[in-house]
Amino acid sequence: MGSFERYRSLTAPLPAQTWAWNMVGAGVENIGRGGKPELEPVPTPGPNQLLVRVDAVGMCFSDVKLIKQGGQHPKLYNRDLSLYPTRLGHEVAMTVVQVGAALQDRFYPAQRLVLQPDIYDAQGRSTAYGYTIPGGLIQFHLVGPEVLAAGPDQQTCYVLPLEGDLGYAAAALTEPWACVEAAYTQRRRLEILKGGSLWIWGHPDDPTPYIFSAGLENPARIVLSDVPPAVEALVRAEARRRPVEIIERNGLTVEALADLRALTDGGAGFDDIIVLDPRSAEGVSAAARLIARRGTFNLVGQTPLDGLCQVDVGRIHYDYTAYLGNRGPDIAASYGKARNRCELRTGGTAVFVGAGGPMGQMHVQRALELPEGPAVVVATDVNAGRLAILEAQFAPLAAQHGKTLVIFNPNAAEKSLAE
């Protein structure tokens, strides 16, 4: 039996110690102790635990953010890493080494696993593997109920059995590929929340003949701020049909918008926000900070803002906030899956910015291989070397699938992409 076969079959003796790259603070210098990994005892699993061997780990730009922010990262909740270290590495391929007594009907030694790291606890709080739960930059570690029986129901298992002969490195790419696929699935709420809180902000002299074709029947609380008479009439008419709490807060300055958070449950923000005829980028930026987790932000108007907005892009990723809009007059036209398409348009043109990076290449590959995908795929990057690799890899794939692949470097082009 060769060394690779021995590795796969677990016939080699289990070491007494394992090397671990623990993260004890922000900065690359705090990965390990003195720039070196640490030796730790290989633990014995309890009844509800697995001892796993980490076979491959992929590193992600999310790890770079974690290194920069340390305990201030949103998924570490101000954790003092000097006292409670964590480990990077959420893209992992694992092999089960030992199985606790209570798990032997579900798992077995030499079983291969991959892991879905976006884990939640009983309170619905993110406890992601490689963040809150120490990750895969270690040779051997325990996996217990925090992964195998987690989620709000305390029954969700976040490991997935891996069948077949997929390579270790390829298996570790399951998580980033899942992220790519998830980008084309609708995970955001696209209608006004039933029983939620709605804030509508406008200006009284707005002459637009607004209508609300659907959704106004959903909120339990509606806060009105300087809305035009037509919109107030719609809300008052709804209140005559059913119980709904209506609160007015008019004459608000941009600086005072933050005070509206007190009108939401637990100060968590509004489930839905509608801004009518927005003009001020500063105002829209301040209003957007009041969106609750999984909330919607609907801009209805035809006039460009007076500048660029400051939007917390991280909340789009971590809190699933949705930014919607239309030109009016139907406020409800912004909502729904039909308007908010999440898949690439069949026969269309898709532009991928930063396409030369690892995730960018995966998005380009998916677009080229998608049977009902775009006809033209534009890959842009400012790194000529990355673009050269991308073209060499994917030009044959584009030809194979009858797609047009356009490579564009804005720093080297004489004309803009639009030209």
Task: Name each region found by the language model.
Residues 41-58, 72-119, 135:
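Glycine-rich beta-strand-centered segment in the early N-terminal region that forms part
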Residues 78-81, 90, 117-195, 326:
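NAD(P)H dinucleotide-binding glycine-rich loop of Rossmann-like/cofactor-binding domains
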Residues 106-109, 291, 344:
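Short, well-ordered loop/turn sites that connect or cap secondary structure elements
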Residues 145-147, 171-218, 330-350, 356, ...:
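Short internal alpha-helix immediately C-terminal to a glycine-rich phosphate-binding loop
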Residues 195-206, 211-283, 333-334, 340, ...:
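Adenosine-nucleotide cofactor-binding segment
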Residues 281-289, 300-321:
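Rossmann-fold NAD(P)-binding glycine/threonine-rich loop
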Residues 295, 348, 375:
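Glycine-centered, small-residue-biased loops immediately flanking beta-strands
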